Amino acid sequence: MAIPPQRPQPPQQAPRPAAPRAGTLSVRAKPVSERAQRFFAPCPRGLEQVLADELVALGAGQVSPTDGGVGFSGPFTLGYRVCLWSRIASRVLWQLAESEYRHEEEIYRLARNVDWPHLFSARETIRVQVDAIRSPLTSLEFVTLRVKDAIVDRFRAAMASRPSVDTSTPDMRIHVFLTAYKATVYLDLAGEALFKRGYRREGLSAPLRENLAAGMLALKGWTGQQPLFDPMCGSGTILTEAAMIAMNIAPGVQRGFAFEKLRNFEESAFNQLREQAAQGARPLLPGLLFGNDRSEDAVAATRRHLQNVGGEATASAVALTCAAMETLPAPAAGGLLLSNPPYGERLNELAELKTWYPAVGAWLKRAMAGWRACFITADRELPGGIGFKPSKRTPLFNGALDCRLFEFELYAGSRRTDRPPHPDGSGA
C-alpha cells in the first residue's frame, strides 16, 4: 500500500499528564487535541477523486488526493464518521508522527517518542507494517522490527506489561511509510479493511471488492435515481453496494472498528453517529435494482447478502433471475448496466471467451439500446470482441489485477464496429 508523504504538521497531542511510574498499570486516556488531526485514507487506485469528493461530503478539510489514496484533516471524531460512512476508502489512518530520517535508528526514535501506552492498553495485540517509495534503507523487515521494538520499549518504560504481536488479526495496526527522506507513523482506526462490510458472512472473499464496486457506482454517478442492472451478478457485490446507497445505509454499520479499543474512544459520540445513521436509512423501492446470473448458487448468495443488509423486504425488492444473459430482455427502458464479466480469472478457457464476446455484443445491440453498459475487466480485448467502441475507459485495480472500466453508450444500429480491435483493446 503506497501511502504518500504528508506535509509536516504541528504537534497534535494535548499537554501530557504526569507519566506513570515504571511497573504500574494505571494509565489514563490522554484527550486528543481539539485542533485538526491529519488522516490518510488509502483506496483502490483509480478511485482517488471520487473518494476525495466523498470525504468532502463527510466534512473533511484539507482534502488532497494522491496516487493510492487521499489525505484529509478534521477533528478526531471525523475518523469515526469516515470509518462508518466511507464506501470507497480501504482504511482510515491517523497520523501520529513524522520526521526526516537517514537510518533505522532515527525511525526507532520517531516511533519511541509516540506515547503508545496512552493510546491503547498492553492487552491489545499489534502488527507493524512498513511501506516505502525510494527509501535508501535496504531492509524494510529490519525497520519493521525496530518500530515494534520502539512500541514495546515505550510500554516497558511505563508499565510491567507489553503488547504481543499478532500478524493475522491484530487489535492495533501500526503503519509506517517511508519516502527517500521522510518517515510517517500512522495508527489504523479501522482495524479490518473497510471493504469488509459484515454482510458477507460466509467468510468467502468476493471476485470484486466491495469498495471497488461502490467506487465504480460513484464514478458513473449512480445515486439510486435510475435503474441498475448487473446481468452477471455473481454473489451480488455490485447489487448489494447499490442497495446500501439507495437505502442510505452506512457501509460500516454492521462491523466494529479498531478505534473502539483506544483509550480515548468517545463512545457517546460514536453511538450518536450510529443512531443518526439508523434514523437516516430508508426502504428500497422495487423496480430499481435488477440482477441475473446463470448460476443458481450465485443468485442464492446475492439474495442472502441483500437479506443481511436490509432483511427480506430488501431482497424481495431486487428482481433476480437465473438465466443465460444473452436470452434476457432489458429490465427497463434505460439505466446503468454495470458488471464484472469473466476475463480469464473466472473462466480459464480463452477459446470460450472468444466465442462468447460476439454473443454479448449481439445481445447488447438487440436488447439494451438506451442503456449505458459498463464492464470492469482485465481483458483489453473485450471492446473489440463485443464489437463496440468504448466512450470511456478508466484504469482501475481490482486487488492486484490491472483492469479497465469500459463504458459503452448503446444506441440501436450505431457505434457498432466490426473492425479488428486496436492494440489497446479500444476497437478504434
Identify the role of each PLM range.
Residues 24, 28-172, 427-428:
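Non-catalytic nucleic-acid substrate-recognition regions in nucleic-acid-modifying enzymes
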Residues 133-136, 192-193, 342-346:
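A short, flexible beta-alpha/helix-coil linker loop
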Residues 208-329, 346, 350-352:
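Conserved S-adenosyl-L-methionine
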Residues 334-340:
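Short SAM/SAH-binding signature in class I
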